[in-house]
UniProtKB/Swiss-Prot annotation:
Family recorded in the similarity comment: Belongs to the EF-1-beta/EF-1-delta family.
Family annotation (InterPro entries): eEF-1beta-like_sf, EF1B_bsu/dsu_GNE, Transl_elong_EF1B/ribsomal_bS6, Transl_elong_EF1B_B_arc
SUPFAM superfamilies recorded: eEF-1beta-like
CDD domains xref list: EF1B
This protein's UniProt keywords: Elongation factor, Protein biosynthesis
Protein task: Promotes the exchange of GDP for GTP in EF-1-alpha/GDP, thus allowing the regeneration of EF-1-alpha/GTP that could then be used to form the ternary complex EF-1-alpha/GTP/AAtRNA.
GO molecular function terms listed in the Swiss-Prot or TrEMBL record: translation elongation factor activity
Protein origin, superkingdom: Archaea
One matching Pfam family: EF1_GNE
HAMAP family membership: EF1_beta
Protein name: Elongation factor 1-beta
Amino acid sequence: MSKVAVLLRVLPDDAETKPEELYKKIAAALPEKYQVAQYQAEPIAFGLEALRMVILMPEETEGGTEELETIIQSVQGVSQVDVLNVTRFSG
């Protein structure tokens, strides 16, 4: 089964929320078919840090990244989810 790698930027709802906290909440909320391949903090401004994530998902997922975005958006502490890139992953 082929997979795609989805690069996301997740913005917290306030500057007090740390990227590591968001990562833990998001990872716990994701179903098994999604796999976090990489994550890192991205400084934005005035102490606000976004979370950049690469998530692997099945290529055949109905609706593309919509389900993934909805799941992450529903996590407490998440303000916004931006899909930055989607590419086929072989490995």
